[in-house]
Amino acid sequence: MKNIRYIDKKDVENLIENKISDDVIIFLSGPTSQKTPLSVLRTKDIIAVNGSAQYLLSNNIVPFIYVLTDVRFLHQRRDDFYKFSQRSRYTIVNVDVYEHASKEDKLYILQNCLVLRSFYRREKGGFIKKIKFNILRQIHKELLISVPLSKKGRLVGFCKDISLGYCSCHTIAFAAIQIAYSLKYARIICSGLDLTGSCSRFYDENKNPMPSELSRDLFKILPFFRFMHDNVKDINIYNLSDDTAISYDVIPFIKLQDISAEESKDMTRKKMQYRTSTDSYAN
């Protein structure tokens, strides 16, 4: 633990400086991700998670960030992790992935990935935990968290600055959203944020099937999204999924044409900026 270098403010600033689009698409594992056209994916920064990166890479789309928070993926699909990490521009893993990695993999992670700190191991409440996070909240205004007094209750939270850490909630989507928010994207657009039925993944897992635990944990997950909606007033987030467990009053639905329309505006603005710069050189 002492030798871990966690993601810091300079890392976040570097990521912000290297963005290539105003919006970001979080490309998740839900079946509806396949409905997002490649033409749209090619125009935006992409945050890929788990095995969803394979689909992007096979279509010559390089993820801006590859995110992994599931220890099982590193253990069961190690070669894929290395491939996805090496072919993405940046990789972010949480501290659990690092701590449960082999010595060789730990070295790779420290040299090639950014490590994300988690504020807690379990979402259980309690008096001591409440005091701890009340103090942290006073020190770090970017940490929004609500901790019940009873250990039977479950805390909920959201961190606006990943250099401090992140609030986990049994789905990598929530980690990716906190990353995207920290990088100050104009719009955060979720693709494949379904969480319905058995919460199956759209990509082939014949080699190393990893049972999804999302349907079992849904009652733990949904309050975090509601908390985000109620407390992160300036977040501009949308869902492309037309089959989702998350209410559209929490994360609004967005049509593909609305993304394309904004994309056209971006292209026009960039052309105008280019013309202005060339005119200034001419003068």
Swiss-Prot record:
Annotated disulfide bonds: none
EC number(s) from the headed UniProt entry: 2.4.99.15
GO BP terms, alphabetized: lipopolysaccharide core region biosynthetic process
Reported phenotype of the disruption mutant: Mutation of the gene results in changes in the LPS core but does not affect the attachment of O antigen in an E.coli strain producing the O antigen from S.dysenteriae.
Name the UniProt record assigns to this protein: Probable 3-deoxy-manno-octulosonic acid transferase
The reaction(s) this protein catalyses: an alpha-Kdo-(2->4)-alpha-Kdo-(2->6)-lipid IVA + CMP-3-deoxy-beta-D-manno-octulosonate = an alpha-Kdo-(2->4)-alpha-Kdo-(2->4)-alpha-Kdo-(2->6)-lipid IVA + CMP + H(+); alpha-Kdo-(2->4)-alpha-Kdo-(2->6)-lipid IVA (E. coli) + CMP-3-deoxy-beta-D-manno-octulosonate = alpha-Kdo-(2->4)-alpha-Kdo-(2->4)-alpha-Kdo-(2->6)-lipid IVA + CMP + H(+)
Recorded name of the encoding gene: waaZ
Gene3D superfamilies: Alpha-2,3-sialyltransferase
Function text: Involved in the biosynthesis of the core oligosaccharide region of lipopolysaccharide (LPS). Required for the addition of 3-deoxy-D-manno-oct-2-ulosonic acid III (KdoIII) to the KdoII residue of the inner lipopolysaccharide core. May also play a role in a lipooligosaccharide (LOS) biosynthesis pathway.
Record-level GO cellular component terms: cytoplasm; plasma membrane
